[in-house]
Amino acid sequence: MKIKTRFAPSPTGYLHVGGARTALYSWLFARNHGGEFVLRIEDTDLERSTPEAIEAIMDGMNWLSLEWDEGPYYQTKRFDRYNAVIDQMLEEGTAYKCYCSKERLEALREEQMAKGEKPRYDGRCRHSHEHHADDEPCVVRFANPQEGSVVFDDQIRGPIEFSNQELDDLIIRRTDGSPTYNFCVVVDDWDMEITHVIRGEDHINNTPRQINILKALKAPVPVYAHVSMINGDDGKKLSKRHGAVSVMQYRDDGYLPEALLNYLVRLGWSHGDQEIFTREEMIKYFTLNAVSKSASAFNTDKLLWLNHHYINALPPEYVATHLQWHIEQENIDTRNGPQLADLVKLLGERCKTLKEMAQSCRYFYEDFAEFDADAAKKHLRPVARQPLEVVRDKLTAITDWTAENVHHAIQATADELEVGMGKVGMPLRVAVTGAGQSPALDVTVHAIGKTRSIERINKALAFIAERENQQ
């Protein structure tokens, strides 16, 4: 049997991390079994579904490289198929037309609630032999079995049972002729030959209804697995107040897709004590029986730690392809300065996100208008004039511009003036970067370049001279 899974989001908003984790688990399960992964857009909610949301879902899937083998299929393009199946069910007696008014249904609901009963349709039209005009408004209901129970073996939670007496005669076609969500899902899973449905636990109550419809259609019933929800670190359901929840927001905030994938796969699944997983390892080790039944807590600090790891562990050339977008957001012209891959090597240890890296690299490519006030006050004092002049001359004399030779020039300055390296290094750092912090000074000066570094030292000396004149 060929394994076939699907990810079926509703395009009413962005791709959130919960949906991304569900997509990842479905994708991994299919890849682990050499199967196929289907993308289906469940856009039957015509009022809330938007093209922008569909694009956002696609963007998120593509950014995470969760490639699909079939689709995307759109439910709105399959209405003829759904209605053909409903008409077939009406002929076979597994569905029936219901003419009950909204007023009657509301009165029935209030009566049942007053008695402490679970509100459900009483089956009046199921047993009615009244004649109705062809154009009289009606819905179509599924004739749910009235006895017995539905049992399915959830691959994460174990056996789950629902009594058929608890289930309603579900509306499968509205008065306007449009099929309903629960019915469309059933026909889609049947037509697309889905073998395993991996989805959120909020769908558990839909499962017995869908199984009963599948059985009425004499269609194969897929295997189900319901993933627990994701909570914030306060134990409450993850929402915007916990920070970013959109996949693309994490891209915008400077996270690598590898970091988010690694974090999401571990958010409810484990393989021993291993924390870091390549994509290939995820595929190799992923099993549904290792997925936890309990809700997971989203920990941004852990994600940040993983992101920092991947910034330094992945090839700099690859990280640079993702950094490029953030550089463009900052409007930095990188034509005159180090290659982005070299920048990743320079700033990787200091920066936990690519956004932070892009925001702290401008001095490598563009001259700054002024020095950081605190850093200049502390380090660009008259006492720094001589160290800066000497190190400038030694840097000017370098014919082979390497980080090693830059280091020798700084060391030689300290030795000549018989001062510690900090007495040379800190004024030089502020002079060439405009700030009091940077990566190692020798590689920083080397990356900034000889001409630009010397120009900035002269600018710092002019700043010191002006400061002396004001005293």
UniProtKB/Swiss-Prot annotation:
Record field: catalytic activity: tRNA(Glu) + L-glutamate + ATP = L-glutamyl-tRNA(Glu) + AMP + diphosphate
Stored Pfam families: Anticodon_2, tRNA-synt_1c
Motif extent ('HIGH' region): 9-19
Domain of life: Bacteria
Cysteines engaged in disulfide bonds, as pairs: none
Residues holding Zn(2+): 98, 100, 125, 127
Function: Catalyzes the attachment of glutamate to tRNA(Glu) in a two-step reaction: glutamate is first activated by ATP to form Glu-AMP and then transferred to the acceptor end of tRNA(Glu).
Name used for this protein in its record: Glutamate--tRNA ligase
